[in-house]
């Protein structure tokens, strides 16, 4: 089979399964409203949980950073791209989250892949929650280590897998809040299982940091857990982009030597680091707490308003509120129905989620108003005019 035949077959299969992905260019894709081609919809697809992507102080910080540093880093942080702005952000993150060190990455995907690629060796074993992010599972499957997946949020099965004989080291992998189901990991029990086995725990808290816990320190702090490796990302609550790995001194030095995604990538623009430092100050402030309180109120309003609706609402109490409808066509039709009624929501289909669990991944933010949630509920209950 030629390359072209292989490509054509794969695309045909996606189309036949109603799983073909398309991008739609928008004027504004974050915040309360999504704007496209002169129209606007209430936006229930953005990960901008605290509404910070449009915050004037963060926008001004980026502009000031660009004036001072320019618009690009100019190279890898190992060459000339590591600025005072990067160092200040790393130090602030480490202080906030209670770790000796923080290392910046250009994305959460890159951070997760870099960690596993740098750490996993032939005789090792990676034990990951089966619903972990694609970046984690892909890196684990491509590594020389043995990959085992435990049943979602099942610390007992994790402990059983970690107890099996092994010549090398073990890495347990999970998320704080899962990106497609919106549920939380039982981190205290997972941490206890990894400690008992002498394993290292990696937690990706992309959807928890900034939103949960005191000063928004995230899922781990809220459950009084301190994993050896904590990944936080900046494209959700921070309203920007990028990521950081929190760890101890020795691990940070090791990653600086062996994390290829860090070594061989141009560093994030210093202006972005300035903006992220501004976002962090807001997240830690009274304003940040007010935004978290507003988000929590919107989540309660939505869940109480859903009542006994027939759609498959999960147990999530996070900003991610999936409605699992099962069939791809039904998910697409429901997304179109919402769009026609002025609400933008995205249908998520396999392979992003398991076959038979297509869904609308609704996301709520602090930028939403009470009437926005009411409108969404009206449409979902079938009362849209």
UniProtKB/Swiss-Prot annotation:
**Name recorded for this polypeptide:** 8-amino-7-oxononanoate synthase
Top-rank taxon, per record:
Bacteria
Binding sites annotated in the UniProt record for substrate: 21, 133, 352
Quaternary structure and partners: Homodimer.
Please name the pathway: Cofactor biosynthesis; biotin biosynthesis
Q: Which family does it belong to?
A: Belongs to the class-II pyridoxal-phosphate-dependent aminotransferase family. BioF subfamily.
Mind telling me which Gene3D superfamilies this protein's record contains?
A: Aspartate Aminotransferase, domain 1, Type I PLP-dependent aspartate aminotransferase-like (Major domain)
Q: N6-(pyridoxal phosphate)lysine-modified residues are where?
A: 236
Q: Which UniProt keywords apply?
A: Biotin biosynthesis, Pyridoxal phosphate, Transferase
Pfam families reported in the protein's UniProt record: Aminotran_1_2
Q: Which HAMAP family match?
A: BioF_aminotrans_2 (MF_01693)
Q: Which GO terms describe its biological process?
A: biotin biosynthetic process
Which residues does pyridoxal 5'-phosphate bind?
Answer: 108-109, 179, 207, 233
- Which EC number(s) does UniProt give? 2.3.1.47
The record's listing under NCBIfam families reads: bioF
């Amino acid at each position: 089979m030629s390359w072209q035949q292989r490509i054509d077959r794969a695309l045909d299969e996606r189309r036949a399964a109603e799983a073909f992905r398309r991008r739609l260019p928008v004027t504004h894709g974050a915040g309360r409203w999504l704007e496209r081609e002169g129209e606007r919809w209430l936006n229930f697809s953005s990960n901008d949980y605290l509404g910070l992507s449009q915050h004037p102080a963060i926008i001004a910080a980026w502009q000031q950073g660009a004036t001072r540093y320019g618009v690009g880093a100019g190279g890898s942080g190992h060459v000339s791209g590591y600025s005072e702005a990067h160092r200040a952000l790393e130090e602030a993150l480490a202080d906030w989250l209670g770790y000796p060190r923080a290392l910046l990455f250009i994305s959460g995907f890159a951070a997760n892949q870099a960690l596993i690629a740098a750490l996993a060796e032939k005789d090792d074993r990676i034990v990951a929650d089966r619903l972990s992010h694609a970046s984690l599972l892909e890196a684990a499957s491509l590594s020389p280590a043995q990959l085992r997946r435990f049943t979602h949020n099942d610390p007992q099965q994790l402990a059983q897998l970690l107890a099996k004989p092994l010549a090398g080291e073990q890495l347990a992998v999970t998320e704080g809040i899962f990106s497609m189901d919106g549920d939380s990991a039982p981190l205290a029990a997972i941490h206890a299982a990894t400690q008992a086995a002498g394993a290292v725990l990696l937690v990706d808290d992309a959807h928890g940091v900034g939103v949960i816990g005191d000063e928004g320190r995230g899922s781990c702090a809220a459950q009084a857990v301190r994993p050896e490796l904590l990944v936080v990302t900046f494209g959700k609550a921070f309203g920007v982009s990028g990521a950081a790995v929190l760890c101890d001194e020795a691990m940070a030095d090791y990653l600086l030597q062996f994390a290829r995604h860090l070594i061989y990538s141009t560093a994030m623009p210093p202006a972005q680091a300035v903006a992220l430092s501004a976002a962090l100050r807001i997240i830690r402030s009274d304003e940040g707490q007010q935004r978290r309180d507003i988000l929590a109120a919107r989540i309660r309003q939505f869940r109480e308003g859903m009542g006994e609706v027939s759609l498959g609402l999960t147990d999530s109490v996070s900003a991610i509120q999936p409605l699992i409808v099962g069939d791809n066509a039904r998910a697409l039709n429901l997304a179109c129905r919402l769009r026609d009624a002025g609400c933008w929501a995205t249908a998520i289909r396999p392979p992003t989620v398991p076959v038979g669990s297509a869904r609308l991944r609704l996301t709520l933010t602090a930028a939403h108003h009470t009437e926005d949630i009411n409108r969404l509920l009206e449409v979902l209950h079938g009362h849209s005019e």
